[in-house]
């Protein structure tokens, strides 16, 4: 509700972009003169709607960071588990890259986020809410125009993937949780030996040198908010793996991923290594298991003994 419906759909090079920018500017001025603030639109309901939309579009794991940060700033009770619940309840209905076939420009041509919102409203996955246009969310969605024959947006009844965009998982590696990307693959369980790195650059070089292979679990630590510092996106490594044709591999990190990241990846491992999290205790060769169904991420090692020895 905080972004005008369809405003972000318009491609950068589309002639309509300028007019869309002007529309947004006028809406901002109107809302200011009406005495509205962002908190009118940032509510628990609107944040749950946003999480459902992220899941439906196969969106980025970064949504967990952004939505919870917005909630904290707005003083709204909304957390990681709310994001998780939304993804468990909302199937992926957009066939978008990196896991699907189409680009954001194709989504725009097919009917855009207005069409996605309409699908979610019709299936009861979102609730009505006010928007900055002055009209309700459902009123905006009702004006969706689906392009005949489009293949980008399906329906909740016939989704691209039933299991949502991402999942929050826990385990002895991530007592406070990690976020596992689900869109773009059908892996339910992965087990393999750890290949441990203390920076994205080291991991990237190892992939380029052929030191990482099929069946491995790449562990990149000290890339969290404190350790990085700044929690960088581990896009280089996932891109390098794809470029070298290495598909049967997992990657876990206390850093984060770009929305363009591809593969079986779990980020935001918490506590991070720099805060003394268990990920700091993993060694090369440790057997790591990531179980989607059980929502677990564990390592076959006595981490307590290792911590005591330090």
Identify the meaning behind each predicted range.
Residues 1-310:
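Catalytic or ion-coupling anion/metal-binding cores of large enzyme and transporter domains
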């Amino acid at each position: 509700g905080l972004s005008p419906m369809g405003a972000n759909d318009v491609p950068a090079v589309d002639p309509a972009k300028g007019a869309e920018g002007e529309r947004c500017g006028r809406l901002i001025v109107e809302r200011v003169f009406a005495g509205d603030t962002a908190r009118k639109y940032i509510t628990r309901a609107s944040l749950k709607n946003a999480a459902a939309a992220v899941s439906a579009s196969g969106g980025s794991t970064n949504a967990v960071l952004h939505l919870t940060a917005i909630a904290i700033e707005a003083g709204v009770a909304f957390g990681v588990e709310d994001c998780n619940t939304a993804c468990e309840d909302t199937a992926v209905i957009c066939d978008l890259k990196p896991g699907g076939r189409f680009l954001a420009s194709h989504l725009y041509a097919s009917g855009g986020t207005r069409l996605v919102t309409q699908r979610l409203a019709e299936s009861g996955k979102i609730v009505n809410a006010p928007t900055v246009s002055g009209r309700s969310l459902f009123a905006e969605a009702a004006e969706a125009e689906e392009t005949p024959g489009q293949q980008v947006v399906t329906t909740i009844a016939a989704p691209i993937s039933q299991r949502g965009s991402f999942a929050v998982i826990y385990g002895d590696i991530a007592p406070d949780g990690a976020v596992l990307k689900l869109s773009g693959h059908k892996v339910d369980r992965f087990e393999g030996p750890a290949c441990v790195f203390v920076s994205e650059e080291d991991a990237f070089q190892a992939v380029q040198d052929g030191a990482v292979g099929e069946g491995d679990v790449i562990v990149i630590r000290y890339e969290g908010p404190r350790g990085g510092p700044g929690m960088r996106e581990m896009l280089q490594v996932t891109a390098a793996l794809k470029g070298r044709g290495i598909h049967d591999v997992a990657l876990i990190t206390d850093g984060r991923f770009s929305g363009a990241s591809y593969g079986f990846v779990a980020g935001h491992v918490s506590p991070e290594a720099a805060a003394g999290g268990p990920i700091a205790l993993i060694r090369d060769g440790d057997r790591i298991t990531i179980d989607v169904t059980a929502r677990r991420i564990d390592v076959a090692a006595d981490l307590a003994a290792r911590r005591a020895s330090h």
